[in-house]
């Protein structure tokens, strides 16, 4: 094999290897990417089917029901509600009326959580959760004012 052909074969092999590595890295990154959604977005079906995502909002008062290690509760953004089921031990700071972020999937209208994170301080809320609650509240106020005035905008 001539040196020129040898260099060309090596360059081609390097390009194929770099392409394969880039494909594997991007695939791993995409499969580990977890998005945050509010209850209003989940109810509006803005969540991709079968994807793991984070659901954030407030635990509705009076909604926590425990059956052994199985816990069910409702997460709300003050406009919409999503029932959540979790099997495991909840964080110590998990309480009704407090902020929560759960990671899992929607199955049959219920969010099946694999992980539940409670707010660590009564004044702290993740920026994504605060923004989602604000948008949901503004959307709910707009809908109620439109219903009151009869304006279909």
UniProtKB/Swiss-Prot annotation:
GO terms of biological process kind: cytochrome complex assembly
Chief location of this protein within or outside the cell: membrane
GO terms, molecular function: heme binding; metal ion binding
Alphabetical list of InterPro entries matching this protein: CcmE (IPR004329), CcmE-like_sf (IPR036127), NA-bd_OB-fold (IPR012340)
Biased composition (Polar residues): 141-153
Stretches in topological domain Cytoplasmic: 1-7
Compartment(s) where it occurs, according to its Swiss-Prot or TrEMBL record: Cell inner membrane
Region: Disordered, residue numbers: 130-153
Membrane topology: Single-pass type II membrane protein
Residues spanning the membrane: 8-28
Periplasmic-side positions: 29-153
Record-listed heme binding positions: 120, 124
GO cellular component, one term: plasma membrane
Keyword field: Cell inner membrane, Cell membrane, Cytochrome c-type biogenesis, Heme, Iron, Membrane, Metal-binding, Signal-anchor, Transmembrane, Transmembrane helix
Record's function text: Heme chaperone required for the biogenesis of c-type cytochromes. Transiently binds heme delivered by CcmC and transfers the heme to apo-cytochromes in a process facilitated by CcmF and CcmH.
Family that this chain belongs to: Belongs to the CcmE/CycJ family.
Protein name: Cytochrome c-type biogenesis protein CcmE
Species this chain originates from: Leptothrix cholodnii (strain ATCC 51168 / LMG 8142 / SP-6) (Leptothrix discophora (strain SP-6))
Gene that encodes the chain: ccmE
